[in-house]
Amino acid sequence: MEEAYRQARKRGEQGRRRAISQSEHPYLTDLDSLVAQLPCGQRENIGLRDIPLEMVVGTVTKGRQSAFSCNFMPLLPWNTEFARKWSNLYDIQISEGYRDPIIVTEFMHRFYVQEGNKRVSVLKFLDAPTVSAKVTRLYPGKWDSVESRLYGEFCAFWYVCPLYEIEFSREGSYEMLAKMLGQDLVEKWPQKKVDYLRHTFLLFKRAYLRAGGDHLDITPADAMLVYLNVYNQDRLLDTPTDIVVNRLCKIWRELVIAGKNDEDKVDLVEAPSVDEEESPAKSTSGMLNFFMGKTVYSAANPLRIAFIHEFPCATSSWDSLHDQGRQYLDEHFGGIVRTEAFEDCHDPDVFYAAVETAVKHGANVIFSTSHRLMEYTLRAAVEYPRVRFLNCSIGLPHQSVRSYFGKMYEAKFLLGALAASMADNHRIGYHASVFASGALSEINAFAIGASLLDPRAQIILTWGDVPAGGLAEAMCREGVSVMTGVDMSKSLEDPTAYGLHRLVDGKVAGIAMPVWNWGRYYELIVRSLLHGTWDETADDQQVRAVNYWYGMSSGVIDIRYAPGLPYQTRKLVQLLRNGIVEGSINPFGGELHSQDGVVQIEGFPPLPSTQIVEMNWLADNVVGTIPQLDDEPKVRAL
């Protein structure tokens, strides 16, 4: 009995000294002092619950605060009444266990003891996982901070799945977990589903801590969400712990990135290096000699690249354009690079079979050409760490897979100016099929471009699919004479479904369209591999995701005019285009206004690229709204 108390007190002193050395409070936090500085809301009686002891962090009042270290271990000497009571409670717990619950207040997903501090101390000393408690929940008075919003999401989760152990540090994670399990945050979950999640989480947490997860800046629940994003088809309860630990080691860099602030997760590479820009076509000694001494690859030992397309190239214009880029590589690099393509790989089994075949064929690099293939690509990248994987998307922070996309907002800025120069009534239509990362920057750049030529221009924004040949009907319905459709039609047979058009005598006539030059884009990425500059892009000491985000200045984005466009109009757009390429014009520089007010005032530099990718507002001359996640089934990251 005495020995147990002395050991507990020793741990208490160690915890107190450690806290002092780290400039932290050495004693228990008291809730009264905490809420005195914060506005609080109503209280709710939660009732009798088993709560995780690791979430019991303090007392309600200051009364016993200095009797315990910050780790809840005792600090008072052995020859005190406090020590004797603690020891008696220790004996009871060892011999028969406690029968009466403690009384706690829950505040912001943590528990503060009103009655039963010494029992908590004994149980923590014995490494007990939970304690029975009568719980009263104290709500925050305001919900305008990240912490309070996260707690609000937890409360919504708790009411349908009453598990305290699941704690996330990122907004939206509870809803994501619910969707993974086929549930929502509205209807109460079946008890079997609650029990399954509890057991699954506890199993995962043990494996996560065994792998060293306590050294990361994420919660075990955060880590489980990352794990399930990669191994989502595996039931954790059926997976041996050793395998889970091994998988965690494979995705360790993904876990590290998950703990970073949003601004530290991704390196946006916005321009190729000088070596990548240098053109082998200008070499008088030929393609092979141009790379001689600069690369380990040759005609006898080529760089092998596989392209995995979501749909057949014969029916999908998006996949067809990417495959044209693939064919350009074969022609351009004269045997140093050899490619192969796998089509119609939207099914996961077909995708993984394609990856396996590509690896057997010696693929050094694998491109997946649709954002919808990122989930499969990530898992494949984890399984084949020696193969370089890239996915056509932007804004997805994965260290195992590099992303690449284009600054389409630059082309949309030009199309907006062009649309305003040809609109009849200040009303211009903008149709978007999906809400995606980058979609709002494209809409706003279009609106800003239009406002340069017509300050009264209004952009009528609509979302959803347009039936083949239905653009004219959509334009009449919205009362616009000029409208831009989606960037790429699903069908090669419907060329009027995308680009900028005007309505003439009830028929749609093309004006201009944005152009992707995927051959150029793939050429720039492949040069980094041939020149050996690929690894220079990423700093191994700073684990970050790499997203290539090239634009007009790199030659990967442009616009194409329809025949018959007046030369004066082409000249105007060309002036704006030159400004973008040279860097003297940026749609998001200077004064900016959203539907809700001023974004930034005159004289400010252009918005940082990360803010452009993650833009969450609409320009003040846009008539329309941003779809909610629940309302828009096609929400995605590009």
What does each model-found stretch correspond to?
Residues 1-118, 125, 170-182, 190, ...:
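Short, charged/polar connector segments at secondary-structure boundaries
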Residues 107, 114-179:
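Glycine- and acidic-residue-rich phosphate-binding/metal-coordinating active-site segment common to enzymes
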Residues 306-324, 329, 342-348, 436-440:
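Extracytoplasmic "Venus flytrap"
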Residues 326, 414-457, 540-563:
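An alpha-beta-alpha
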Residues 362-371, 390-392, 480-489, 508-516, ...:
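Periplasmic-binding protein-like
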Residues 382-405:
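Flexible loop/hinge segments that line or gate small-molecule binding clefts
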Residues 404-426, 515-536:
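Hydrophobic alpha-helical segments within soluble ligand-binding/sensing domains
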Residues 532-537, 541-638:
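Segments of small-molecule ligand-sensing domains
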